Amino acid sequence: MTSIESHPEQYWAAAGRPGPVPLALGPVHPGGPTLIDLLMALFGLSTNADLGGANADIEGDDTDRRAHAADAARKFSANEANAAEQMQGVGAQGMAQMASGIGGALSGALGGVMGPLTQLPQQAMQAGQGAMQPLMSAMQQAQGADGLAAVDGARLLDSIGGEPGLGSGAGGGDVGGGGAGGTTPTGYLGPPPVPTSSPPTTPAGAPTKSATMPPPGGASPASAHMGAAGMPMVPPGAMGARGEGSGQEKPVEKRLTAPAVPNGQPVKGRLTVPPSAPTTKPTDGKPVVRRRILLPEHKDFGRIAPDEKTDAGE
């Protein structure tokens, strides 16, 4: 990069210098009677004839040079002052931009550090919600299973309430047994409710309904069989079911084994292609016979015994 150097003092000095001296008139021959004298006089006059224009041009050039020197001195001085002011402004702007850049960098660094810290509570809440979802689903499943068991028990009680003969048995129990009339044997309630996690199965020892039939005489079975103890007779099936209904039995797990698929195991190895056997193709027609043809010159000149035998064999 080239630098521009200016010297305003020298420019002002050049502008203040005196002007050039005008050209003086040259000597003119006085002339004479001869032709040579006349020619010399004409030459002197022609030389001095253009001195006025030459002096005017020299003075104009000097004036223009002085004006340019003064203009350069003024412009360079003003340009230097303007450049100094611009440099001061650029320095101030650079400081402001540097300060703004430093502030932006600090804010970006603080944002990068504070961003994860501000997201920690939200992430903790999301983790807590994720941990609570399995517990809530388990509680909902448990509540659903209890509700289904209660509904099944209510349906069984409603179905048993309308059976014939239960009213008389209950009445006899009130008379003979005191407070035993308000209870219902478990044999009449049917099988216990099956958990929802296993397929519904019914034990073979728990009948769904009582097989008790009223006697033909019209008397209630409880009054006919009441003895000294005052307790009603209970069918054997009901007694067996009462002991079994005290606790919920788990259904028997069944395992199904699918038959194995023949040749269903994966096969590992490499497949090697056997080399192809060479095939021979019979040629159609007779085999081609090659014959040797000798020119007459070859037979006459340079013929030897092996050539004779070869020609005879062919």
From Swiss-Prot:
Residue span of region Disordered: 165-314
UniProt keywords, alphabetically: Cell membrane, Membrane, Transmembrane, Transmembrane helix
Cellular compartment(s): Cell membrane
Cellular component, GO annotation: plasma membrane
Superkingdom assignment: Bacteria
Extent of Gly residues compositional bias: 165-184
Residues that span the membrane, as ranges: 23-43, 98-118, 221-241
Coiled coil start-end: none
Protein topology in the membrane: Multi-pass membrane protein
Signal peptide annotation: none
Biased composition (Pro residues): 190-202
Biased composition (Low complexity): 203-212, 219-232
Keyword RNA-binding among record annotations: no
Biased composition (Basic and acidic residues): 294-314
The protein's name: Uncharacterized protein Rv2083
Species assigned in the record: Mycobacterium tuberculosis (strain ATCC 25618 / H37Rv)
UniProt lineage: Bacteria, Bacillati, Actinomycetota, Actinomycetes, Mycobacteriales
